[in-house]
């Protein structure tokens, strides 16, 4: 986020003498390359679901929602790089009205990426829970109509929240709201996991008769969640430290890894499609048919 970058640069100037940790600077080409790969991979996921009717189910629609979130995160960085390039070439007036508006739009995309990922993973967790413990009623509970309504509400909420957070991005309550959604999502999914574990112990025989794909879907969610936490948690921690201890030498030392934390976010968009392909034979076959022009 541009607001965070600007605040970080200001913090760096005021706290430079309090820390011996130099800033870790990564070439912009690395960010650009990872972002382009992330967009292309997730675009293939979306096209695979759109073109294959056997993949047009609630579970894959939720995966598409996560793929869109990943694409927004990658697109954010590409647009930011283009904006910086135009500004350095003199085509944009520094801190002019156009650049400020473009910054706000790009920041909104970044927030949409995080919020979209959080809620997409949450509905995938709920979907897996229903699949395992209400297998017989699954198709009557999780219908396509309810899936579309749920995703529409999620993205409307994320869009409204993203716009609000950009407008009030310099207020501490906004930062707290932004960062609190991350642990709240983890708590929600953790509660589902604990409940699933307790029910699994009491219904072990019943669960053993479920199709293997049901349990495989739960494992896929676990992997996706683990990658999401690994890639996003360092950035969320950076925002908290920048807000509450900007001049502490230990906090400043951690914040010197800002660009590394940003690269991890970009990597999340690249890793997720590989998880889909590795864990889902149907999606993997769809990828092969698309890449080899239906000759596979």
Curated annotation (Swiss-Prot):
Coiled-coil ranges per UniProt: none
Lipidated positions per record (S-palmitoyl cysteine): 293
Membrane topology, as annotated: Multi-pass membrane protein
A GO CC annotation given for this chain: plasma membrane
Residue ranges annotated as Cytoplasmic topological domain: 50-58, 127-147, 200-217, 279-296
Localisation per UniProt entry: Cell membrane
InterPro entries: ACTH_rcpt, GPCR_Rhodpsn, GPCR_Rhodpsn_7TM, Melcrt_ACTH_rcpt
SMART domains on file: 7TM_GPCR_Srsx
Pfam families to which the protein is assigned, alphabetical: 7tm_1
Keyword annotations from UniProtKB, A to Z: Cell membrane, Disulfide bond, G-protein coupled receptor, Glycoprotein, Lipoprotein, Membrane, Palmitate, Receptor, Transducer, Transmembrane, Transmembrane helix, Ubl conjugation
Residues that span the membrane, as ranges: 24-49, 59-79, 105-126, 148-168, 181-199, 218-244, 257-278
Residues of this chain annotated as glycosylated in UniProt: 12, 17
UniProt modification remark: Ubiquitinated by MGRN1 that may be involved in post-endocytic trafficking and/or degradation of internalized receptor.
A GO BP entry: placenta development
Free-text disruption phenotype from the record: Most of the MC2R knockout mice die shortly after birth. Adrenal glands are considerably reduced in size compared with those of their WT siblings and they produce aldosterone at reduced levels.
Regions of this protein lying in the Extracellular compartment: 1-23, 80-104, 169-180, 245-256
GO-annotated molecular function: corticotropin receptor activity
Disulfide feature: 21-253, 245-251
Recorded family membership: Belongs to the G-protein coupled receptor 1 family.
Subunit and partners: Homodimer. Interacts with corticotropin (ACTH). Interacts with MRAP; this interaction targets MC2R to the plasma membrane. Interacts with MRAP2; competing with MRAP for binding to MC2R and impairing the binding of corticotropin (ACTH).
Function noted in UniProt: Hormone receptor primarily expressed in adrenal cortex that plays a key role in regulating adrenocortical function. Upon corticotropin (ACTH) binding, facilitates the release of adrenal glucocorticoids, including cortisol and corticosterone. In addition, MC2R is required for fetal and neonatal adrenal gland development. Mechanistically, activates adenylate cyclase (cAMP), the MAPK cascade as well as the cAMP-dependent protein kinase A pathway leading to steroidogenic factor 1/NR5A1-mediated transcriptional activation.
Name of this protein: Adrenocorticotropic hormone receptor
Annotated organism of origin: Mus musculus (Mouse)
Gene that this sequence comes from: Mc2r
